Regions:
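Extracellular carbohydrate recognition and processing domains
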Residues: 83-103
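Short, charged/polar surface micro-motifs in flexible loops or helix N-caps
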Residues: 54-55, 78
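Short, surface-exposed beta-strand/strand-loop-strand elements in extracellular ectodomains
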Residues: 67-85
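Structural alpha-beta junctions
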Residues: 137-139
Length: 172
């Protein structure tokens, strides 16, 4: 399985809400731990990742610093529009350590992923790296279709999530 969170796989950041030449958004997908994108204050902040075609998502992992609340959304569209929420998570602050959060969606497809940083533990947050494992497909999977035999992959109907809980959407 290819890591779709890397520019080497054909993925790229096509939109970011802030830009600092020293910490550009492209650092999110360069695969290096010594580079990162720094959001330049005020919330929400966001970036949109274009995948190299339609993929079934098996795992999405993101490494951040100072992020408090994050929303992960996807779209099957050929353009970065009409995003649907996958999960919302409140992250614990870890002074001097990166936060690593992993989502294991079941039967979800995406052409684009949008990561919205809704709030932070400090005025500035950073996104260091992401890893996205998935399989190429030609058939989009609708968010309205229930997963086959498994629970947990539905649109989030409310934003309240328990602190420290898994990065998995609740059953609607």
């Amino acid at each position: 399985m290819t890591d779709l969170g890397l520019s080497a796989s054909g993925s790229n950041v096509v939109q970011a809400s802030s830009f600092d030449a020293r910490y550009p958004p492209k650092c999110i997908v360069d695969g290096r731990m010594d580079t990162f994108w720094m959001a330049t204050g005020l919330y929400p902040q966001q970036f949109v990742l274009k995948l190299p075609g339609l993929h079934i998502l098996d795992r999405v992992s993101i490494q951040t610093y100072n992020v408090k609340d994050i929303s992960i959304e996807r779209t099957n569209s050929s353009e970065p529009v009409k995003f649907e929420p996958i999960a919302i998570k409140t992250l614990q602050h870890q002074t001097g350590k990166l936060q690593t959060e992993t989502l294991s969606p079941q039967e979800l497809t995406a052409n684009y992923l949008r990561f919205r940083i809704l709030s932070g533990h400090a005025p500035f947050v950073s996104v260091h790296r992401m890893s996205i494992l998935g399989r190429e497909t030609r058939t989009p999977i609708s968010m309205d279709r229930p997963p086959s035999g498994e629970q947990g992959t539905r649109v989030i109907r409310n934003a309240a999530q328990p602190a420290g809980g898994p990065l998995v959407p609740p059953v609607a």
